[in-house]
């Protein structure tokens, strides 16, 4: 699993043209922690995976290797739900 996560995080970051420092600036995840994720030395927490999925326009399931579909799930619009009632 670590190899899947590290490869996907690296590919997603490079596809966006971001450095690890840019990821830190956008998410607040410390660069050294993010580097450890890309090298398979630690896993992202659920909160970190959520931040990364938003930054990279993908799903948490894709980051964790649960699916091979990199497209993000549709985001729910809570205001839309309120308007329907």
Model-identified regions with their sequence ranges:
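A short, Lys/Arg-rich alpha-helix, primarily the initiator
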Residues: 1-15
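Residue-level signal for the short linker/turn that defines the boundary of a DNA-recognition helix
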Residues: 7, 17-18, 44-47
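Residue-level recognition of specific faces of alpha-helices
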Residues: 8, 33-36, 48, 62
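DNA major-groove recognition helix of helix-turn-helix/homeodomain DNA-binding modules
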Residues: 28, 47-62
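The alpha-helix within a helix-turn-helix
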Residues: 13, 24, 53
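Short alpha-helical DNA-recognition segment
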Residues: 17-39
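Short, charged recognition helix plus adjacent turn
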Residues: 15, 64-85
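Residues within the helices of the helix-turn-helix
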Residues: 10, 21, 50
């Amino acid at each position: 699993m670590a190899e899947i996560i590290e490869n996907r995080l690296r590919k997603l970051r490079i596809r966006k043209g971001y450095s690890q420092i840019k990821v830190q600036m956008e998410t607040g995840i410390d660069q050294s922690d993010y580097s450890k994720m890309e090298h398979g030395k630690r896993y992202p927490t659920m909160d970190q995976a959520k931040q990364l999925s938003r930054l990279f326009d993908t799903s948490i399931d894709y980051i964790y290797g649960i699916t091979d579909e990199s497209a993000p799930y549709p985001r729910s619009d809570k205001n839309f739900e309120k308007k329907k009632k």
